[in-house]
Each structure stands twice: as structure tokens, then as C-alpha cells.
Amino acid sequence: MTSYQDLGLTPIINATGAVTRLGGAPMPPAVLEAFCEGAGQWVPLEQLQAAAGQRIAELTGTEAGLVTAGSAASLTLGTAAILCGFDLGRIERLPHCDDFPCEFVIAREQRSGYDHAVRAAGARFVEVGFNEIVSNAGVRRTEAWEYEAAFTENTAGVFYGYGHDSQPPLPEVIERAHRHGLPVLVDAAGELPPKRNLSEIAALGADLVGFSGGKAIRGPQSTGILCGRRDLVASAAIQMLDMDDHLNLWDPPPELVDREQLDGLPRHGIGRILKVSKEEVLALMTALELFSSGAYDAEWSEQHARLETIAAGLSGRAATCTIEGSIEAERSPTLAIAIDEDALGRTAFDVCRGLRDGTPPVYVGHGRLAQGTLVINPLCMSDDQAPELSRRIGEELGG
């Protein structure tokens, strides 16, 4: 077996949490067992995806589901499905779609680097609205009528980045889009927990919703979920699966795709680069069952205790420690370490850099460094790492 050390790497203390750049969330033993079991057996992938999709549909309250190669892959596949449907010619031409509708309307304030996944399928964005609060120009944000005003014969759909503060409200956007027969693709990659979002976002009327499988669900980091309308999920599936078969032998389960809707056998679609292994499907489905049943809830108290250990070890340092979060939020508690930069003579960025460069390397949450605060998330830490982390931070704070 090849280890990280064999490759010349030193494993870090991940005090950041389930972020992609550090490898995602820890997979529970049952998820790892499912992955290994899947590795030793073989099934047709269209049958596996059909069965998994039925269970995803049950848990999300949607018509159909698909296991994808991450939430970004869900967005690319969802976009491709909206652009093409079951039109084999369009499927063949992606990402070149100049001769059919390919524009997605999006709130200007919801643009991000992640929406490259939508553009990768060939879509073009039409931006609407302003966040005049952020620009210090007023009190208004994007409003639903602005979406509708941007709809033209070139509009294929609407893209919406879901969050607790997203504006305008998703139901208002959906209502405007559906007036014109336009589907709405929702990016909800990081919106789990709470568990209820698995079904509540789609219940608002979204046509397709994408979730991450390697964060709160704690499946393989390279997995995600796409769920929603049966016809769109079916289109996404045939643009992802291996289509190297004879037409008279290809027999996908009707729960996945109705062959009668196809004029022939598609060639490999744009989603072929986003394939998912059988092991990943089994592992993701195992993790999804654990997540949706609340099996992870009992870990909150253990995580809180780790943070208490870290905070106690930093008593008397040039920092103030505050444990944030509640069990009701269904998220791991976090420890905010507000550094007295004047007393220390170093900035939070300096401390963060020192933690990464030390032994063992430590990666902390960096979202509040500009405010002089380190954030510790215990999700990816073990109990024996808490004292070591406290020691390392203490060293950087002058101890």
C-alpha cells in the first residue's frame, strides 16, 4: 500500500472542516465498508444509478435522482440536461450551442467562481439586478421581476445560488420562470445541514437541485447528488453514462430513462468526463442514509468537548476563545480565536501561515482572518489531535 509518507507528504491536522481543498469530510466506517464491498463486485452502471436514483427521489421528495461526480458535476449535468433534453443532435454538439437557446438568467450578486460548472456545458449567463447594499448605493437587492424582464427566445433556464440570505426568494424566481416554461437549476452544494433542505428546496418548485456528497453527507469527496424532474435527470444520466453498446442490446431501466423518448442511442455526452464509479455510488448512498437518519447528530457533544480542550490550553494567551454554534443548527460547533494582534505583534494571517508551515502542519478556517480571528472546526479532527492543536496554536501565540 502506498501511503502519504511514501509520496513525501506529511498528514496535516485539518481544523478547517469538510473543504474540498483538504479532501472533504471523514467517511464513517460503514461508508468505507460499502466502498470496499462495491470494489469487489460488478453491476451495470445504468441499473445501479436507477436504483440509487429511486432512493434519492424518496429522500428528496423529487421525481428522480442521480449520483454525480460532485456538486459541480451536478451543475454541469443539470445545465446540459436543460440545454438538450432528449435531442441527440444537441447532446452531440455540446458545448457548442449557438443554434439553440443557451442563456441562463442569474442574479448578478449570485455570480461566483463555482458557476464555471454551468458555463462548461456551453451555457452563457445573462446577469440581472444589483446588490446596492454591498455597493453602498442604496437599500435594494435583486428583485424577481428583473429575471422575467431578461427572458428572451434565447433563454434556456434560470440558475439560482441557494443560501440563507439569497435574494430574491427562490419561490418568487421559480414562479416567474415557470410562467414562461423555463426550468430553474439550483446550486445547493453547501446547504446541508439542515437535513430538511434535502427535500424543502425542491419542494419550493425547483426543477433541478444539486448537493455535495462529500461534505455534510460524508460520502466520498468526489460525489454529489442531482435531483428533480424525471425527464431532466434522465437527460443528465444519458449524457454521463458510458454509451458504448449496441442499440438493440441497450436496455436501461425505465426508472432511469424511457427509451421510447430517444430517437437512437446517444454517443458519449459532455458528462462522460464526470463519470462516477460503482464504489462511489454505494458509499454515497450509505452515507446519505446515515445523514438523513440523524446518525451523525450524536457526534456534536464529542466535537464540543474537543473545542473545550483546545480553548483551555490557550488560556492566558494573546487571544480570546469563543465556542460558537448549537446542536439545533445541525452543524459542527466551531471555536473562534480572536487574536490580540497589537499585543502579539503578529497578524492572524501570520499565525495562520506559521501553523501551516510548522510540524505537524495545521490548517484552520481562514474566512475571518481579516478580522483577526482563526476558526477551528473539529469535524475532521480526532480526540488525540485536540491537545496537539492547542499546543501548536500556543506556540504561534508566543508560548
Question: How should each PLM-predicted stretch be described?
Answer:
Residues 1-22, 26, 53-67, 72-279, ...:
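Conserved PLP-enzyme active-site core in the AAT-like
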Residues 45-50, 64-66, 247-250, 294-303, ...:
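Flexible, glycine/charged-enriched surface loops at secondary-structure junctions
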Residues 20-32, 42-51:
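A structural motif shared across PLP-dependent enzymes of the aminotransferase-like
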Residues 267-270, 290-297, 374, 379:
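Glycine-rich phosphate/diphosphate-binding loops and the adjacent beta-loop-alpha structural elements
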Residues 3, 311-392:
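Conserved C-terminal alpha-helix-loop-beta "cap" of PLP-dependent enzymes
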Residues 277-339:
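Active-site pocket-lining segment
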Residues 81, 392-399:
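C-terminal alpha-helix
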